[in-house]
């Protein structure tokens, strides 16, 4: 059976797409706008949540992007140096790895995920 091989893009509305795109490039290092972002290999999770979840922070929020990082502590330090508020909660961490949360300048929640090291 043929199946999907990965996520080809993430598209969302923004009040000021150019400015928000630059924020994602400058703060998170994600190539956006006119370029293609070649990701490093790693797991991707697609997980529908119940309609009444509070996991996305805002009731009207229909989605939340989760970016994989290799060193969550270093990323948190970098973001805080830039004055970006970072939320962590030990209850979010699991056998899947460690998590933190930020918001982009338009209030969209962004989850940062350091996957757990796989045992050989």
Please give the residue ranges for each predicted region.
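A structure-centric signal for secondary-structure junctions around beta-strands
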Residues: 4-7, 43, 59-62, 96-97
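Vicinal oxygen chelate
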Residues: 1-6, 12, 76-120
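Secondary-structure boundary/capping motif
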Residues: 19-20, 64, 99
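Core segments of cupin and vicinal oxygen chelate
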Residues: 1-5, 11-47
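Conserved short beta-strand elements that form part of the metal-binding/catalytic scaffold
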Residues: 28-63, 102-105, 109-116
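Mid-chain, well-packed structural core segment of small domains
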Residues: 58-83
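Short linear motifs in intrinsically disordered
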Residues: 27-30, 66-68, 89-92
């Amino acid at each position: 059976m043929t199946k999907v091989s990965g996520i080809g893009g993430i598209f969302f509305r923004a009040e000021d797409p150019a400015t928000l795109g630059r924020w994602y490039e400058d703060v998170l290092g994600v190539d956006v706008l006119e370029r293609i972002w070649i990701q490093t290999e790693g797991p991707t999770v697609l997980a529908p949540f119940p309609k009444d979840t509070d996991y996305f922070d805002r009731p009207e929020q229909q989605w939340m992007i989760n970016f994989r990082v290799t060193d969550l502590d270093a990323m948190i330090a970098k973001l805080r140096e830039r004055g970006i508020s970072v939320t962590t909660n030990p209850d979010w961490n699991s056998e899947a790895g460690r998590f933190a949360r930020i918001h982009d300048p338009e209030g969209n929640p962004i989850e940062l995920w350091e996957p757990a090291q796989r045992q050989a």
